[in-house]
Every structure is written in C-alpha cells, then in structure tokens.
C-alpha cells in the first residue's frame, strides 16, 4: 500500500498567510478553523469511503446487471462472418448467449456484452479500468466496503484490460473492416484510461496482455503525431470555425495519451515528437483569442508559435453544445488534470503547458456574471452565491444543462486542482477554491448517500437524473484524480 498524505497540503506559508488575513480583518479563530490546513481531519477518510462506495456499485450492480459481465464468452459476434449485417450478428449473439461466470473464462468478450464498439460500449468500461487500477495502485481499495476482494477486483480489471485493448485495431493488423475500435475522436481518451491502469499494474499483468496495451498506445500516439490536425473553435483571424462547439476538451483528452506514451516508452525514438505535439495540444486546448501571436513563454516556447487559433473565450468561458457550458469548462480542467496526474505519478515536474489558462477557466466559473450571456441570470454565477454573496455549493449556467442533474464530483475535482495548483490566486478570499471544495464535497456526499427504491448503494444518480452513459464511472474517475493530486502525489 502506498503511503497516504495529507488531504489539504496547504503548507506553513498558507497558514501564515491566512493568519495575517484573519488578523488584518479582525476575523475570529473561526477563520483559521475553516482554513484548508485545518480542515476536518476525517475528510480524507470520507473521500476514500465515498470512492469505495461507488466502486461497490460499479463492481457489483453495474458489473452484474447493467453491463452483464457475468455473461461472458471467448467467441463473440465481432469474430463472426464479416458478411453478416449488424442485425444478423446480434441474432447470432443472442442464440449463443450462455451464463458463464467471469472467473471461468480466460477473456471477457467486451463487445459481445455491450453490443457497441463506440463510445457507449467502451468509454464507461475504460473509466472503470482507470479507477480500479488507481485504487489498487494507491492502496485505498477497501474490499470490506466494496464487497469484492482485492484479488477479484484486480482479476476483473485485468480481464477488462485484455478484452478492450484486445479489440483495438492495432491488435488486428490484418482486419479489413471496422469491427475494431481506434483512430476516432474519443479513442485516445479510452486508450489512455486503459493504458494508465495497465501501466500502474504492469507487474501484475501477463506479458501477452501488456503487449496488447503497448500496441494500442503506440498506435494512438502514431495517429496523433502523423494523422491529426489540431482543431480550433475560432481561427487566428477570429472567425468561428465550429459554431457552438469548442474543441478544447477533445484536444485535452487526446493529449493525455501522448503523456502516457512518453512514460510507458521512455527510450522511444518518438519521444521528442510526442513531447512537441503534447505541448502544442495542451496549449491549444485552452488557448484564448489574445494568445494568438503572443510572445508569452510556456516551457520556454512562444505561445504564438504553437497555436493557430483558440478554443476558450477571452473571459475564460467556452461554448459547447451551443451553450456556455459549465460541464465542459469543468471537463477541460479534468482532462488537463489527467496529464498532470501522469506527471505526478511519474515523479516528473508538471509542464507549464498542462496548466495553461486553467486559472482563467476556474476564475470564470466563480467570477463571470451570467447576465453577460443571459439577461435573466444577471447577478448570478456558474458557482452560485447566496443573497449575501457567499458560496453555496450549487451550480448553474445560461440555459439548461442538456446532460441533466449536476455531478458534484467533477466540481470537487476542479476545486482540488485550483487549491493544489494555485489556480485561484486572483480570486478573493471568501471565494477561494478551498471554500468551494468543502461545499462541493458535501454536495457529493449527499448525492451518493441518498436512498431510493430504484437506486443501488454507491450510485451517485437516480435513474433519469443524468443521461451521460459513463456518468457513474466518470464521477469515480474524477475522485481518483483528486486523490492523486491532493493525497498520494500532492507535489
């Protein structure tokens, strides 16, 4: 088990600063009691409990019911006659469906079970693989809470790694159709989720399985170097190229695959190319109009020479799904956070590009008046304040969130990132990241603790509350990131 570290690494300098603030403004001892360095001693333990509660859901109800991983076969419809239509393949699949415990087969057949080779079939599983891998690696997996032994959790994770990586196109070089996944707008994201877990557990994975992962990661990295043009919401002249659709979060989730590749293959001749493209992609993901042509240096390179457009508005907001969308502001922070997590685990300095403009985005979530984009919301903010201007922990946005009810785990991660990386340095003390962090933690705890007839233990959402197919495993992914940044690898 890895040594766990303090949940809120504020340091003596932070405490000294808070003491000065409290004294200068005549605050009482309550000010220090609520400071990040003096947060409730049980917060870290409660975070671990919440993560294990969600793993309880994912490795039991989700695994056995929603994903039917108890139904497994080593021959699936993707290996059937290529002349069959999708409908015919599904008919073959159903006719041969048998109940087999996952322990009794050498390899799970992920596409037999999910019937999808695209996002809905792969992404939720990739997040689960990521989360179980990190829980085992960082040592907070609690089999007493989850109800699945650590050995079984590891076996389940490894079988999923083998199954999903095994269906990547790189492991079927002679295939002439599109049965296998890869080289798509999200495939680098899925590959990094799977690859990170495999890399962390590499000493526990059979060489032939790890080789599948290596081929998958190398193939996706090759695509990003040689067959990928960085997209921009707005070009260098200010013309909107993709109306209503920033490309920032997509670039960020692809970039992290290159970060993984550089650590998995430190001696590769491609490492220089990976690092160069990684730098460009990270900066492009969060570039603002004023960054175009800028002489500002990031990791010793001029920003203006690395980008040819922007994906974030000048005030730190962004547009996605034709909305000024808080979910995607948070998602960019989360995806950039994945790259930071890799550097922290590898013990290397985090590049400046990985935090480029993240402070502007986080500040916008707290400080941008929504009346700028929706007159009916004048005087309101993405992070909601009460009538006295104090943080509440609730969130909103111009228009209605098209995904449904908010998932507070991602906002908690954003706050942890802002607190540990100093993204809130320009924000007034009453609305510092640690204040929101505490509030969003409580919202998240309330969310997972709710009881209802149709809600399984450890589930964040009630049926119908959120339409994102990966929402449960994605919430856990955010918490696993937060744990790395604040506890296991805070610096």
Regions found by a protein language model. Give the residues of each.
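Residue-centric detector for conserved, function-critical "anchor" positions
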Residues: 380-397
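Terminal, non-catalytic domain-edge segments
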Residues: 36-113, 134, 138, 264, ...
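Compositionally biased regions
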Residues: 11-14, 29, 273
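Bacterial N-terminal signal peptides that target proteins for export
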Residues: 3-17
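Sec-dependent signal peptide cleavage junction
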Residues: 25-38
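Bacterial N-terminal signal peptides
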Residues: 16-26
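Aromatic-lined, polymer-binding surfaces characteristic
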Residues: 117-359, 367-372, 400-410
């Amino acid at each position: 088990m890895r040594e766990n570290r303090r949940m809120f690494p504020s340091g003596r300098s932070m405490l000294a600063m808070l003491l000065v603030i409290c004294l200068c403004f005549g605050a009482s001892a309550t000010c220090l009691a609520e400071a990040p360095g003096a947060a409730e001693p049980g917060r870290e333990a409660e975070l671990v409990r919440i993560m294990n509660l969600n793993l309880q859901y994912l490795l039991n109800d989700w695994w056995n019911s929603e994903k039917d991983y108890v139904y497994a076969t080593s021959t699936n419809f993707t290996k059937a006659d290529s002349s069959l239509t999708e409908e015919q393949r599904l008919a073959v699949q159903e006719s041969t469906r048998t109940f087999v415990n996952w322990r009794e087969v050498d390899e799970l057949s992920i596409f037999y079970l999910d019937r999808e080779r695209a996002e809905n079939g792969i992404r939720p599983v990739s997040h689960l693989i990521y989360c179980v891998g990190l829980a085992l690696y960082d040592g907070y997996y609690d089999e007493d809470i989850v109800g699945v032994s650590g050995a079984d959790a590891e076996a389940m994770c490894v079988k999923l790694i083998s199954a999903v990586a095994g269906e990547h196109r790189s492991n079927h070089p002679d295939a002439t159709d599109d049965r296998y996944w890869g080289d798509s707008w999200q495939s680098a994201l899925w590959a990094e989720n799977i690859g990170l877990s495999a890399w962390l557990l590499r000493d526990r994975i059979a060489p032939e399985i790890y080789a599948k992962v290596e081929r998958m990661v190398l193939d996706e990295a090759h695509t990003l170097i040689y067959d990928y043009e960085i997209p921009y919401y707005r070009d260098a002249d200010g013309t909107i190229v993709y109306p209503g659709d920033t490309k920032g979060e997509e670039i960020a989730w692809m970039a992290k695959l290159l970060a993984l590749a550089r650590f998995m293959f430190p001696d590769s001749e491609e490492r220089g190319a990976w690092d160069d493209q990684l730098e460009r992609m990270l900066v492009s993901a969060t570039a603002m109009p004023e960054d175009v042509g800028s002489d500002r240096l990031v990791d010793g390179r001029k920003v203006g020479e690395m980008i040819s457009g922007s994906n974030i508005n000048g005030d730190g907001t962004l547009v996605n799904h034709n909305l000024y969308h808080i979910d995607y502001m948070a998602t960019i922070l989360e995806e950039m956070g994945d790259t930071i997590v890799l550097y922290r685990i590898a013990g290397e300095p985090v590049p400046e590009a990985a935090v480029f403009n993240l402070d502007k985005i986080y500040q916008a979530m707290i400080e941008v008046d929504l009346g700028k984009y929706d007159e009916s919301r004048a005087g309101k903010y993405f992070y909601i304040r009460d009538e006295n201007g104090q943080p509440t922990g609730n969130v909103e946005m111009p228009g209605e969130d098209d995904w449904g009810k908010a998932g507070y785990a991602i906002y908690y991660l954003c706050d942890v990132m802002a607190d540990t990386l100093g993204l809130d340095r320009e924000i007034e003390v009453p609305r510092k990241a640690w204040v929101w962090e505490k509030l969003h933690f409580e919202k998240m705890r309330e969310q997972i603790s709710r009881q209802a007839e149709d809600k399984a233990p450890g589930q964040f959402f009630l049926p119908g509350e959120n339409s994102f197919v990966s929402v449960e495993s994605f919430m856990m992914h955010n918490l696993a990131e937060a744990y790395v940044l604040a506890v296991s690898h805070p610096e």
